[in-house]
């Protein structure tokens, strides 16, 4: 699951995926404008339960939503302390994040890598994404209008850019090898 929480005038994007039949299949993709914070927290929790979500990647620019979601599922809310504890024990950030169900993602650091990863999944071997066009038209529109400017998404040119960001976050779960196998964590 990938979540781009709303702040300012942006929308709240949610994308849920699963690996089935050799493809990343979209189970849920929606964008909400000016949503109620509590309603979004409840919706995300319900989607996590309904789809038995293993990992939730959330834009780290909204720490209050991340902490609220972590509290709701019984995970340590102060994720900065968790990461610091792993560091003090000689483990890296990756070990701490691997043990988390709700994972904060620093878009400033990772946006280019996530865009490249997204392009690779969409383009390699004819694409590895299955999207129902009758259910997820906003996601399809966002993918069709996405513009890559030297590894950075041109948000002005991209329709539904918040659902696109949630899609990129959801794809962090998948790691492909040359043999078409998918490893996920």
PLM regions and their residue ranges:
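Short, flexible active-site recognition loops that position polar ligands and cofactors
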Residues: 152-160
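Acidic two-metal-ion nuclease catalytic site recognized across multiple nuclease folds
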Residues: 171-185
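Conserved active-site and cofactor/substrate-binding residues in soluble primary-metabolism enzymes
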Residues: 9, 39, 161
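Conserved helicase/translocase motor-coupling segment
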Residues: 1-31
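Mg2+-dependent endonuclease catalytic cores in nucleic-acid-processing enzymes, primarily RNase H-like
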Residues: 20-152
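Active-site-proximal flexible loops/turns
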Residues: 11, 66, 172
């Amino acid at each position: 699951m990938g979540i781009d929480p709303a702040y300012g005038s942006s929308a709240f994007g949610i994308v849920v995926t699963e690996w089935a039949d050799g493809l990343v299949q979209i189970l849920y993709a929606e964008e909400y404008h000016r949503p109620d914070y509590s309603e979004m927290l409840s919706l995300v929790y319900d989607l996590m339960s309904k789809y038995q979500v293993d990992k939730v990647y959330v834009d780290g620019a909204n720490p209050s939503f991340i902490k609220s979601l972590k509290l709701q599922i019984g995970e340590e809310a102060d994720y900065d302390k968790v990461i610091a504890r792993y560091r003090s024990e000689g483990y890296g950030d990756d070990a701490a994040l691997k043990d988390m169900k709700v994972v904060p993602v620093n878009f400033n650091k990772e946006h280019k890598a996530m865009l490249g990863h997204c392009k690779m999944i969409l383009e390699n071997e004819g694409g590895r994404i299955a999207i129902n066009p009758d259910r997820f038209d906003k996601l399809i529109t966002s993918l069709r209008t996405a513009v890559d400017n030297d590894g950075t998404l041109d948000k002005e040119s991209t329709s539904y850019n918040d659902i696109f960001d949630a899609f990129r976050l959801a794809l962090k779960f998948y790691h492909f090898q040359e043999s078409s196998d998918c490893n996920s964590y």
